[in-house]
Amino acid sequence: MMGQNQTSISDFLLLGLPIQPEQQNLCYALFLAMYLTTLLGNLLIIVLIRLDSHLHTPMYLFLSNLSFSDLCFSSVTIPKLLQNMQNQDPSIPYADCLTQMYFFLLFGDLESFLLVAMAYDRYVAICFPLHYTAIMSPMLCLSVVALSWVLTTFHAMLHTLLMARLCFCADNVIPHFFCDMSALLKLACSDTRVNEWVIFIMGGLILVIPFLLILGSYARIVSSILKVPSSKGICKALSTCGSHLSVVSLFYGTVIGLYLCPSANSSTLKDTVMAMIYTVVTPMLNPFIYSLRNRDMKGALSRVIHQKKTFFSL
């Protein structure tokens, strides 16, 4: 009987966003514009880092991977949301739902790991400037990026395989705009204790520990600055770390608030809004944060534009 129940669910229904029918077209245009902005902004950062030799440094290696992660993170959920809003068809096949969940976890976890790597890079740059090149060697940086990809791949695969073993009965309505893992667990009609324990344990490893490592890095940075207080040193630290701190606050603020600090009167609307912030808004804002507050990125853009003008004027 349980096997029949599992195979009877061939697809799920995504309720999407709690918007009125008359607001559908406006919201569709808004999310399409946000998605295109995310794609173009992050692609611009990747291309600039690739083309400008001045940006071939550890910090920008991590940033290019972060931009790629943001680009993919949005692409996991937003195209399906736009399709459902346009076609008025909220269904998603069972296999597609698990696939979406897998890539959502992969790129979300990858962002967490890369933010830690960038925090460590800033820590070394400010606290050990004379040894920066020796510590942040190309081999170390490539190893960190490769390890981040491997760990997040296995973590996402673990949760996906555990989800695939569950049985789903008659209820196939997901009160979300994507296949959220916690929402899927609520629909399962088999024992989910193993899944919940793995989420609890791995959540600490993937979210809490990286966040604490970032806090530790910035605590050491602040301590280093206070030892030799000067307006020049403070300005340098702010210019070096300001963009990264903004991104960390956006990402971890919403994720921790949603998954690790749920309120007693938690509602579907609140969960949807907070999920929208870190899946749509944060990836869109990251390119603006890093380009508008970063002299290196502005300089790289100017040099690339100047080179193109020179090329076409020949």
Swiss-Prot record:
Subcellular location per the Swiss-Prot or TrEMBL entry: Cell membrane
Record-annotated disulphide pairs: C97-C189
Cytoplasmic face residues: 50-57, 121-139, 220-236, 293-314
Protein encoded by which gene: OR1E1
Gene Ontology MF term list: G protein-coupled receptor activity; olfactory receptor activity
Listed SUPFAM superfamilies: Family A G protein-coupled receptor-like
Pfam families associated with the record: 7tm_4
Name this protein carries in UniProt: Olfactory receptor 1E1
Annotated transmembrane regions: 26-49, 58-79, 101-120, 140-158, 196-219, 237-259, 273-292
Membrane-topology annotation of the record: Multi-pass membrane protein
Keywords carried by this UniProt record: Cell membrane, Disulfide bond, G-protein coupled receptor, Glycoprotein, Membrane, Olfaction, Receptor, Sensory transduction, Transducer, Transmembrane, Transmembrane helix
